[in-house]
C-alpha cells in the first residue's frame, strides 16, 4: 500500500477509555511495521443542558448538565497489509466510536 495513509478518528465520552484504545491502536500499528503520527488530541466538544429544578415554579432555580465528547486523530503512514489485518481484528472498548478513512 505505497503512498497511502490511514486516518483514524476516535470519539468517546470518557477520556481514559479513549486513551487506552489509542494506545492499543498505536502498539498494534507499530508491531506490524507501520509508522504512526499522533495521537493528536482534538478540541473537546461540550454540550450543556439547562433545566428547571422544579417542574412547577421557581424559574430562577436551574440545574446544568453537560456532555463532553473527547476526540483523537491518528495517522498511519504507509501501512502494510499486516497492519490493515491487525487493525480490522482489533477489539476496542465499548463506548469508543471509530472512523477510518483510507
UniProtKB/Swiss-Prot annotation:
GO CC aspect terms:
ribonucleoprotein complex; ribosome
One Pfam match, given by its short name, reads Ribosomal_S10
Recorded GO molecular functions are:
structural constituent of ribosome; tRNA binding
- Which superkingdom is the protein from? Bacteria
Q: Which InterPro entries match?
A: Ribosomal_uS10, Ribosomal_uS10_CS, Ribosomal_uS10_dom, Ribosomal_uS10_dom_sf
One GO BP annotation here?
Answer: translation
Oligomer status and interactors: Part of the 30S ribosomal subunit.
What functional role does this protein have?
Answer: Involved in the binding of tRNA to the ribosomes.
By its UniProt entry, which HAMAP family does this protein fall under? Ribosomal_uS10
Q: What is this protein called?
A: Small ribosomal subunit protein uS10
Amino acid at each position: 500500500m505505497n503512498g497511502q495513509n490511514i486516518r483514524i478518528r476516535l470519539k468517546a465520552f470518557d477520556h481514559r477509555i479513549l486513551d487506552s484504545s489509542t494506545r492499543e491502536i498505536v502498539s498494534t500499528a507499530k508491531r506490524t511495521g507501520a509508522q504512526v503520527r499522533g495521537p493528536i488530541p482534538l478540541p473537546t466538544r461540550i454540550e450543556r443542558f439547562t433545566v428547571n429544578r422544579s417542574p412547577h415554579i421557581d424559574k430562577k432555580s436551574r440545574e446544568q448538565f453537560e456532555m463532553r465528547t473527547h476526540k483523537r486523530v491518528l495517522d498511519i503512514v504507509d501501512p502494510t497489509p499486516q497492519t490493515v489485518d491487525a487493525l480490522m481484528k482489533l477489539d476496542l472498548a465499548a463506548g469508543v466510536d471509530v472512523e477510518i478513512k483510507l
